[in-house]
Swiss-Prot record:
Gene transcribed to yield this protein: chlL
UniProt-listed GO biological process terms: light-independent chlorophyll biosynthetic process; photosynthesis, dark reaction
GO molecular function, one term: ATP binding
Protein name: Light-independent protochlorophyllide reductase iron-sulfur ATP-binding protein
Family per record: Belongs to the NifH/BchL/ChlL family.
Region of interest called Disordered, as start-end residue ranges on this chain: 1-20
Cofactor(s), names only, from the UniProt record: [4Fe-4S] cluster
Highest taxon, organism lineage: Bacteria
Summary of subunit composition and partner proteins: Homodimer. Protochlorophyllide reductase is composed of three subunits; ChlL, ChlN and ChlB.
EC nos: 1.3.7.7
Chain sites annotated for binding Mg(2+): 43
Native source organism of the sequence: Prochlorococcus marinus (strain NATL2A)
Biased amino acid composition, Basic and acidic residues: 1-11
PROSITE patterns in the cross-refs: NIFH_FRXC_1, NIFH_FRXC_2, NIFH_FRXC_3
Amino acid sequence: MTSTITRKEDGEGSVQVKQDPKAQIQEGALVIAVYGKGGIGKSTTSSNLSAAFSKLGKKVLQIGCDPKHDSTFTLTHKMVPTVIDILEEVDFHSEELRPEDFMFKGFNGVMCVESGGPPAGTGCGGYVTGQTVKLLKEHHLLEDTDVVIFDVLGDVVCGGFAAPLQHANYCLIVTANDFDSIFAMNRIVAAINAKAKNYKVRLGGVIANRSAELDQIEKFNERTGLKTMAHFRNVDAIRRSRLKKCTIFEMDSEEEGVVEVQNEYLSLAQKMIDNVEPLEAEPLKDREIFDLLGFD
């Protein structure tokens, strides 16, 4: 039976499904949740960041939290079955599953899981994410993991898709140098602050993606207390790597911009390993963003 908790227990104005303590990822692993506006490039960013961590010698697990289940295909070079699909095949008797049924090895040893989701208009994606973590723990698949990356659906900040924040140490927000992306980022900051009242998650910073300039992002950062951790310009090799179903680390290093992008991902991964300082950011009111951004 599902139970709810009071608003004050889970952040101001928030009523969430209470998480089973047994589903928590144990201390020791660095857990990162990647959020951002829908279509901003979170899956590409997450997969390349996972690859970068693996290049630095870390054991990495990436969990895709989108019903589209396309988070990890540049790591595995294919679309893999989702946890929810596999569970349905065994009538949700998880004891009948083997790890290889739902976890797949990708580029440079990165382990990949796609949680999937319920059919459109039904169920809760957050529940699916919770069941995925529970399944991984039941099979002792998190015990030797150094880094866990949650790639989260769009800019939805409801109780369901805020579920990864209950596991994460840090949240990274992917944005572009435009109003819509920054507006979505502001909402995500508010959601993280609500969760941070009772969970360990903290803001890690901003990843600027597909952006030649940073002026609007930096203007927002200055007002809110955020910080840009990495900057990826609109390099065509990134787009083509996704079409080739591979990470940026598998692209020809002679191609324009490839080495620069690889180094930026490696730098970001190293910053996260070095225990990045949590940020204390305050979101703006909607009207304040309208007044702040853009040109007169």
